[in-house]
Amino acid sequence: MRRFLFATILDICTMLDRHRQKKTLAPSLAVLDSQSVKAPHASDRGIDAHKKIVGRKRHVAVDSDGRLLLVNMTPANVADSTGAQMILDAMYRKWPSVKHFFADGAYERKSLMDKATYLGFVVEVVKRTPGQTGFQPVAKRWVVERTFG
């Protein structure tokens, strides 16, 4: 019950903030990303082999200004594209106005693209410029990185 109360409060705050910024109440675009976090004592955890982290993974969707729309927690060993499919299902029900998603290269998977097409979404994979090293925010995805900040 509390989880739904928190989600409802978050949705209302998101819409009020969008209204204050003179935007439509419901977003039409979202940015997807995930972040692995250490949680050695969590009962439902996994190992993110790429980042060598034992814990959980946050899969998030934010609007064009970085407002949190959805969060999904999974064990860290769940692939980004699998977590994104769960986000797409929830977005279809909760924010039907969102039709376009930006994501990084980890989301360029046939299963995710098929799911997005089936639900009527467009997932645009935004890659870094060739030869780029280290962390540099990518123009269309920086808002989600700032949200993790």
Q: What is the predicted function of each stretch?
A:
Residues 1-149:
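Short alpha-helical elements
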